[in-house]
């Protein structure tokens, strides 16, 4: 990246076509052909050449069948071979990333401006191709020029294509204005100009697509060679805001939703927006339930004094129960300390089984089965709530403690006698955020009959 200063020029620039070039074939000397057609090149010029011309000279042509369907089948096979990942699909068009990090349609595989019995691939190393052409022109003409290898690309949010640099040598491909101040005194914090792409687009105005003019020269710019290449123009997928197409991003979100749920035991102090909890609860209430009922209620402990009173009472009961088991005091305190998460979490919600709509049976077996069915339904709603929180960036941890103190929970919270607490859910932003977990191997946990 070039240092701060103006990347443009107030003086006129020229964009000159290089006429008289042959139809290039594998093995041709591109540098010699350009030197012969443009002996007028001089120091500081920028030679802009289409990647197609470079590919032809470097033998990056693949024989293709004349039949349109077979040709298209081969093209798709080549796209698969050249691409390292697919970012987006629309109809039969694939937007891909190739091994160099270039993101464009069809991995640069192209059937234009080549024979109908051929398909062209991008150069293996466009930056190396640019450096080689620059060195060859220096050898033949004794001039110091910059070289850009270009290809046609679409642009996010805008119709139409433009040429962009895929290979570069001899010029600063980027110009950063960070720290510079404009004429109004405003500091330019993030402005960074893709000089190489601007030059590539300008040169295409004389190269065109149907003129058989694969090389142009841009003259009049102040070119600085900082050793950068076109690779510096590529933003890695991990840093790019648009590294997937819309449909693909939605699909990834669907596939990762379950995997985002983790048991988070340490939360940051950041407050939890109430609307996020309400939204997650609303989604959780769509979980499957028997008899078209709503067998779950979520009790949100929003009043700090109420939460503390409940947790203190549960702690006292837990201590008494453990002491009754004959456990030593040190062991009791370790076990009781595990419940501290419910004091520390920004929010706590208690899921309740509510038997409204449950069927009555004269025998214990079916009555127990009905209760089990309602319990499973509440469990489904709890899992749905945890996932709903996770997809909103909230961590959670389900803790079963209230199950062991059902009467106490009902008494402290003033709830009906037939409401059954099924644990407690601590909610907050994770102190140490983590990504989606890996799926488990079903192994012998998935039984086939």
UniProtKB/Swiss-Prot annotation:
Cofactor(s) annotated in UniProt: Mg(2+); Mn(2+); K(+)
Sequence positions that bind FMN: 261-265, 289, 400, 437
Annotated positions binding GTP: 21-24, 51, 56, 113
Keywords: GTP-binding, Ligase, Magnesium, Manganese, Metal-binding, Multifunctional enzyme, Nucleotide-binding, Oxidoreductase, Potassium
Residues binding a divalent metal cation 1, per UniProt: 110, 151
EC numbers, comma separated: 6.3.2.31, 6.3.2.34, 1.3.8.17
GO MF terms, alphabetically ordered: coenzyme F420-0:L-glutamate ligase activity; coenzyme F420-1:gamma-L-glutamate ligase activity; GTP binding; metal ion binding; oxidoreductase activity, acting on the CH-CH group of donors, with a flavin as acceptor
Signal peptide residue numbers: none
Residues reported in the UniProt entry to bind coenzyme F420-(gamma-Glu)n: 321
Biological process annotations from GO: F420-0 metabolic process
Keyword flag GTP-binding: yes
Residues given in the record as a divalent metal cation 2 binding sites: 152
Pfam families: F420_ligase, Nitroreductase
Span list, region Coenzyme F420:L-glutamate ligase: 1-245
Biochemical pathway: Cofactor biosynthesis; coenzyme F420 biosynthesis
SUPFAM superfamilies per the UniProt record, alphabetical: CofE-like, FMN-dependent nitroreductase-like
Similarity comment: family membership: In the N-terminal section; belongs to the CofE family.
Cited function: Bifunctional enzyme that catalyzes the GTP-dependent successive addition of multiple gamma-linked L-glutamates to the L-lactyl phosphodiester of 7,8-didemethyl-8-hydroxy-5-deazariboflavin (F420-0) to form polyglutamated F420 derivatives, and the FMNH2-dependent reduction of dehydro-F420-0 to form F420-0.
UniProt protein name: Bifunctional F420 biosynthesis protein FbiB
């Amino acid at each position: 990246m070039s240092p701060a200063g103006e990347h443009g020029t107030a003086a006129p620039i020229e964009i000159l076509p290089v006429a008289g070039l042959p139809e290039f074939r594998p093995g041709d000397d591109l540098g010699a052909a350009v030197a012969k057609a443009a002996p007028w090149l001089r120091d500081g010029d920028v030679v802009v050449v289409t990647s197609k011309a470079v590919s032809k000279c470097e033998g990056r042509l693949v024989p293709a069948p004349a039949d349109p369907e077979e040709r298209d089948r081969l093209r798709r096979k080549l796209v698969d071979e050249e691409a390292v990942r697919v970012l987006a699909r629309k109809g039969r068009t694939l937007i891909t990333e190739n091994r160099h990090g270039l993101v464009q349609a069809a991995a640069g595989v192209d059937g234009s401006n080549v024979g109908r019995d051929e398909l062209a691939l991008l150069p293996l190393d466009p930056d190396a191709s640019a450096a080689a052409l620059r060195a060859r022109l220096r050898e033949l003409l004794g001039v110091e020029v910059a070289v850009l290898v270009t290809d046609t690309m679409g642009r996010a949010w805008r119709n139409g294509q433009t040429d962009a640099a895929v290979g570069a040598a001899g010029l600063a491909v980027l110009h950063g204005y960070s720290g510079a101040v404009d004429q109004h005194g405003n500091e330019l914090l993030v402005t960074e100009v893709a000089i190489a792409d601007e030059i590539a687009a300008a040169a295409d105005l004389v190269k065109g697509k149907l003129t058989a003019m694969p090389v142009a020269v841009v003259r009049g710019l102040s070119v600085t060679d900082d050793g950068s290449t076109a690779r510096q123009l590529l933003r890695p997928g991990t840093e790019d805001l648009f590294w997937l197409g819309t449909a693909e991003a939605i699909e990834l979100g669907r596939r990762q939703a379950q995997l985002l749920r983790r048991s988070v035991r340490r939360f940051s102090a950041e407050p939890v927006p109430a609307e996020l909890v309400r939204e997650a609860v609303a989604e959780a209430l769509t979980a499957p339930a028997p008899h078209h009922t709503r067998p779950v209620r979520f009790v949100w402990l929003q009043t700090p004094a109420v939460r503390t009173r409940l947790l203190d009472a549960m702690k006292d009961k837990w201590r008494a129960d453990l002491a009754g088991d004959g456990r030593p005091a040190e062991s009791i305190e370790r076990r009781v300390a595990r419940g501290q998460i419910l004091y520390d979490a920004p929010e706590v919600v208690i899921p309740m089984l509510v038997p409204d709509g449950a069927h009555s049976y004269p025998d214990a077996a079916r009555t127990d089965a009905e209760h089990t069915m309602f319990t499973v339904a509440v469990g489904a709603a709890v899992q749905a709530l945890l996932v709903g929180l996770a997809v909103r960036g909230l961590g959670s941890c389900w803790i079963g403690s209230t199950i062991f103190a059902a009467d106490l929970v009902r008494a402290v919270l003033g709830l009906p006698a037939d409401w059954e607490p099924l644990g407690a859910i601590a909610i907050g932003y994770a102190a140490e955020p983590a990504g989606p977990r890996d799926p488990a191997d079903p192994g012998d946990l998935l039984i086939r009959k």
